[in-house]
Design a protein with these regions (language model features):
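Mid-domain catalytic core of redox enzymes
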Residues: 1-58, 65-72, 76, 88-89, ...
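Hydrophobic, well-ordered secondary-structure elements that form the walls
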Residues: 11, 40, 60, 86, ...
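Short FAD-binding loop at a beta-strand-to-alpha-helix junction that anchors the flavin cofactor
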Residues: 57-59, 123-142, 147-150
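Flavin (FAD/FMN) cofactor-binding core of flavoprotein oxidoreductases
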Residues: 67-68, 79-127
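A generic alpha-helix signature
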Residues: 73, 77-81, 146
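Active-site-proximal substrate-binding core of FAD-dependent oxidoreductases
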Residues: 101-103, 159-185
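Internal hydrophobic alpha-helix adjacent to the cofactor/substrate pocket in enzyme cavities
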Residues: 147-165
Length: 185
């Protein structure tokens, strides 16, 4: 499954060093802005307790298909670019108290033409192997909420199967029977 690289730059600031009110979830950066940053989540505004009292936590997503290769930039370069791009919009002053950089070379699945059919074929192949399931952002939606919904449907299906006949995927393994194994252990 093709995927674009992504870097996440998290920055902690004193609340007094951020002039923007940060009331909301964050912001997205349009393609026309020509920035490495795709968007910024205002973590401390969105989630209680995410940052100590008197501080804010900002999480910038950098790279994606818009800026391939960003995940390979040095952590210092990524943090400096993200900070420089956020500063005019959020009114950042001074240096962050702390910064973290996480890089994933294959983070965002790219749903190309034929994706639904490709996933259908993959799931049909997986169905021939009891207990093997495909779930996650590569299959049913790149948003975290889509991954949770798909996992919930999968778990519900397994719970229903197990309740209905007492033989979910773990029952097959407990019996020592594997598909295409030829009867041996």
């Amino acid at each position: 499954m093709p995927a674009a690289g992504l870097a996440v730059v998290a920055l902690a600031y004193r609340a007094t060093d951020v002039t923007h009110a940060l009331q909301g979830y964050g912001h997205l950066v349009t393609r026309g802005e020509k920035q490495l940053t795709l968007g910024v989540v205002w973590e401390s505004s969105l989630f209680d307790g995410r940052a100590p009292e008197g501080t804010v936590l900002l999480r910038a997503m950098v790279g994606g298909v818009r800026n391939p290769g960003c995940a390979e930039l040095s952590p210092d370069t990524l943090a400096e670019r993200a900070t420089a791009e956020m500063t005019p919009l959020l009114g950042l002053r001074g240096e962050p108290l702390r910064r973290w950089v996480f890089r994933w070379p294959a983070a965002i699945p790219q749903y190309e033409r034929g994706h639904i059919e490709r996933v259908r074929r993959m799931r049909a192949a997986a169905a021939r192997h009891p207990g093997l399931e495909l779930c996650g952002t590569s299959y049913d939606g790149i948003a975290f909420s889509a991954a949770i919904a798909a996992a919930d449907r999968l778990a519900s299906r397994h719970a229903t199967d197990a309740a209905g006949n007492g033989a979910g995927p773990s029952a097959t393994l407990a019996a020592g029977s594997f598909a295409n194994e030829g009867g041996g252990r």
